[in-house]
UniProtKB/Swiss-Prot annotation:
Binding site for substrate: A300, T301, T302, G303, R304, S305, R306
Organism of this sequence: Yersinia enterocolitica serotype O:8 / biotype 1B (strain NCTC 13174 / 8081)
Compartment(s): Cytoplasm
Manner of cofactor binding, per the entry note: Binds 1 Mg(2+) ion per subunit.
Gene from which the chain derives: purA
Function comment: Plays an important role in the de novo pathway of purine nucleotide biosynthesis. Catalyzes the first committed step in the biosynthesis of AMP from IMP.
Catalytic activity: IMP + L-aspartate + GTP = N(6)-(1,2-dicarboxyethyl)-AMP + GDP + phosphate + 2 H(+)
Classification via CDD domains: AdSS
Name of the protein in its database record: Adenylosuccinate synthetase
Length: 432
C-alpha cells in the first residue's frame, strides 16, 4: 500500500523544506509541486554540493524519482529553461525526470512588469514581493484570461490570445503606471522558441497520480512558501497569491483529498520573514543579528536579508489547525547553539491589555501586539551535524519537547545542518 506525504512550511517560508523533500524522496516514486512559482527558493546540499531550485521539484536529483509541476503552479518558461539548463550542465537528465500539467498558467514578461510597477507605486506600503510576476499571473488565471502551458500546442491560437492580453496589460502599464509597454513580438518569439520543449513534458497529472496511487507508489507533495503566507489564511495582504496550506494539494495537483496520508510541517527552531508584514517576535537587536548570521538568513531567491525572531508557537498552532499536521520536522536547531537562553512565544498581549492565544486573521489585527514569552535555558554544546537523538544536549531536548507540548504535534524529524545526512528521522512519514 502506497503512502502520500505532504511537506509544507508552518511559518513565513524559508523553513528548510527543500532539504527535507530531497531526503525523504529516497522512498518516493513521484514528487509534486502544487502551488507557487519561481518565487520559491529550495536549497539542497548533497555531499557538500549546493543546489538551489526555484521551480523544479526537489526530487529532481534522484534518478528513481519523477518530478511533476502541477496545475496549481504558475510557470515562467524562461525561469524553467534556465533551471533545466543549469541542471543538465551538471549531468542531471531533467527532461527524462520532469513532467508538467498542461493547466499550469504561464508567467510572461508583462506579469513581471506589472508586479514591479505596482510595488513601485505602493512606495512605503509595498508588500515586498519577489518581483517575479507571481501575483499578476494568478490574477489572470482567476480572471480566466491567462495563457496556460496547454495553449502552446496551437501556436497560431496562442499568438492571437497573447496579442489580446498584451494589449490589455500594456494599457494599464502605460496609462496608469506610466511605465514602458511590453513588446508583444519579443514575448511571442521567446515563448514559441521553447514551446516544443515544454509541450513534450506535458502529461495528464491527475490521471497519472491516480494510477500511481492504485499501484501503491509512494508520492510526495512539496509546498512552497509557508502557511502564514497563504492567500486565505495568512497575514493578508502581506501574503503570496496561492494556497500554501495542505488544502492546496488537491486543487493544485488533482489528487483526491482523501488520499493524503501524512502532513509534515517544517518548523524552523526560530522565526524568519522576508518582506513586509506582521512579525510579533521580531528581534532588532544583537540576538536577531546572531540568528541571521548563524542561520545564513539571506533569501535563496532574492538575496534579501531575512527578518529574524523567536519561535512563535501561537502562529505555529494556527498552522497545525489549518493543515491537520501529522508531525513536525524541526530545522536549524543548531543555529540556537551558544545562546544562554531561548524563548518561545506562547501568547499575545493585545493593545487593550487582553491576552490571547490565537492569531488575528488580517494584518490590521496584528498591529500593536506584544509577544508573551516563556524563557528556557539555552545550551553551549554544538548540535551542528549531530545525527543521534541521544547525543543532543538536554536543554535542546527540553526545547523540542516543549514545542511538542505546546502544539500537540510530535517532532518526527530533526535537522542539524544543511546536508542531506545531517538529519535525525525519529519517525519516517512513509511508515507513520
Amino acid at each position: 500500500m502506497g503512502k502520500n506525504v505532504v511537506v509544507l512550511g508552518t511559518q513565513w517560508g524559508d523553513e528548510g523544506k527543500g532539504k527535507v523533500v530531497d531526503l525523504l524522496t529516497e522512498r518516493a516514486k513521484y514528487v509534486v509541486r502544487y502551488q507557487g512559482g519561481h518565487n520559491a527558493g529550495h536549497t539542497l546540499v548533497i555531499n557538500g554540493e549546493k543546489t538551489v531550485l526555484h521551480l523544479i521539484p526537489s526530487g529532481i536529483l534522484r534518478e528513481n524519482v519523477t518530478s511533476i509541476i502541477g496545475n496549481g503552479v504558475v510557470l515562467a518558461p524562461d525561469a524553467l529553461m534556465k533551471e533545466m539548463t543549469d541542471l543538465e550542465a551538471r549531468g542531471v537528465p531533467v527532461r527524462e525526470r520532469l513532467l508538467l500539467s498542461e493547466a499550469c498558467p504561464l508567467i510572461l514578461p508583462y506579469h513581471v512588469a506589472l508586479d514591479n510597477a505596482r510595488e513601485k507605486a505602493r512606495g512605503a506600503k509595498a508588500i515586498g514581493t519577489t518581483g517575479r510576476g507571481i501575483g499578476p499571473a494568478y490574477e489572470d488565471k482567476v480572471a480566466r484570461r491567462g495563457l496556460r502551458v496547454g495553449d502552446l500546442f496551437n501556436k497560431e491560437t496562442f499568438a492571437i490570445k497573447l496579442k489580446e492580453i498584451v494589449d490589455y496589460h500594456n494599457f494599464q502599464l502605460v496609462h496608469y503606471y506610466k511605465e514602458e509597454a511590453v513588446d508583444y513580438q519579443k514575448v511571442l518569439d521567446e515563448v514559441l522558441a521553447i514551446a516544443d520543449i515544454l509541450t513534450a513534458m506535458v502529461v495528464d497529472v491527475s490521471e497519472l497520480l491516480d494510477s500511481a496511487r492504485k499501484r501503491g507508489d509512494f508520492m510526495m507533495f512539496e509546498g512552497a512558501q509557508g502557511t502564514l503566507l497563504d492567500i486565505d489564511h495568512g497575514t493578508y495582504p502581506y501574503v503570496t497569491s496561492s494556497n500554501t496550506t495542505a488544502g492546496g494539494v488537491a486543487t493544485g495537483s488533482g489528487l483526491g483529498p482523501r488520499y493524503v496520508d501524512y502532513v509534515l510541517g517544517i518548523v524552523k527552531a526560530y522565526s524568519t520573514r522576508v518582506g513586509a508584514g506582521p512579525f510579533p517576535t521580531e528581534l532588532n537587536d544583537e540576538t536577531g543579528e546572531f540568528l541571521r548570521k548563524q542561520g545564513n538568513e539571506y533569501g535563496a531567491t532574492t538575496g534579501r536579508s531575512r527578518r529574524t525572531g523567536w519561535l512563535d508557537i501561537v502562529a505555529v498552532r494556527r498552522a497545525v489547525q489549518i493543515n491537520s499536521l501529522s508531525g513536525f520536522c524541526m530545522t536549524k536547531l543548531d543555529v540556537l547553539d551558544g545562546l544562554k537562553e531561548v524563548k518561545l512565544c506562547v501568547g499575545y498581549r493585545m493593545p487593550d491589555g487582553r491576552e490571547v492565544d490565537t492569531t488575528p486573521l488580517a494584518a490590521e489585527g496584528w498591529e500593536g501586539i506584544e509577544p508573551i514569552y516563556e524563557t528556557m535555558p539555552g545550551w553551549s554544546e554544538v548540535t551542528f551535524g549531530v545525527k543521534e537523538h541521544s547525543k543532543l544536549p538536554q536543554a535542546a531536548l527540553n526545547y523540542i519537547k516543549r514545542v511538542e507540548e505546546l502544539t500537540g504535534v510530535p517532532v518526527d524529524i530533526i535537522s542539524t545542518g544543511p546536508d542531506r545526512e545531517e538529519t535525525m528521522i525519529l519517525r519516517d512519514p512513509f511508515d507513520a
